[in-house]
């Protein structure tokens, strides 16, 4: 140590107390660490089965909630035109529907679109029925974006939407038999679609009631 007095600098030897080894400021109660510390506890690492079961539990609760809320209304979008145009003349309409049905099947999706012959919900749209030749056919879906796309493809159709509390209510129809005359001269290089191709897209409740 150095002591400064006036202008003189005198060397003072360190005392014995200053030379003592000072203890570390760490409690002796801590255990001696012989291994590297881990920032995360091994008990926090959960197996993948835990997340799988959690997901199943969440999915189950969602299903239960949806079953409780069956009384809530759902919005349905639809395109409608006369049956002759929609089912017999507009051939690429059939191709669009079967392509979408194949897409849903490959990805195991629940079908959300249907064809409804003479739908009962048209009674609530007098402005549409005034412009519509009968019998009429509607393409109904809960997917508004896809219905907008189909409207651009079909062009000569009318669009609107409505709400219903059940699928049976939304897809209810009046019994109608469709018969189209076969063309006298078919010039296309492929055979014409057979009548009844649309049965695949009719609501299941309608098919069962017709039996």
UniProtKB/Swiss-Prot annotation:
What GO biological process, any one, is recorded here? chlorophyll biosynthetic process
The annotated transit peptide is positioned at 1-80
Q: Name one Pfam family in it.
A: Ycf54
Location comes to: Plastid, Chloroplast
Q: Name one GO cellular component term.
A: thylakoid
A GO MF term? magnesium-protoporphyrin IX monomethyl ester (oxidative) cyclase activity
Domain of life, source organism:
Eukaryota
InterPro entries to which the protein is assigned, alphabetical: Ycf54 (IPR019616), Ycf54-like_sf (IPR038409)
Without the gene, what phenotype results?
Accumulation of MgProto monomethylester (MgProtoME) as a result of decreased CRD1/CHL27 accumulation leading to reduced cyclase activity of the MgProto monomethylester (MgProtoME) cyclase complex. Leaf chlorosis due to a massive loss of photosynthetic protein complexes.
- Could you list this entry's UniProt keywords, alphabetically sorted: Chloroplast, Plastid, Transit peptide
The record's function comment reads: Involved in the biosynthesis of chlorophyll; acts probably as a scaffolding factor in the MgProto monomethylester (MgProtoME) cyclase complex to stabilize CRD1/CHL27, the catalytic subunit which catalyzes the formation of a fifth isocyclic ring to tetrapyrroles to form protochlorophyllide.
The entry sums up its family as follows: Belongs to the ycf54 family.
Subunit structure of this entry?
Interacts with LFNR1 and CRD1/CHL27 in chloroplasts.
Name it.
Answer: Protein YCF54, chloroplastic
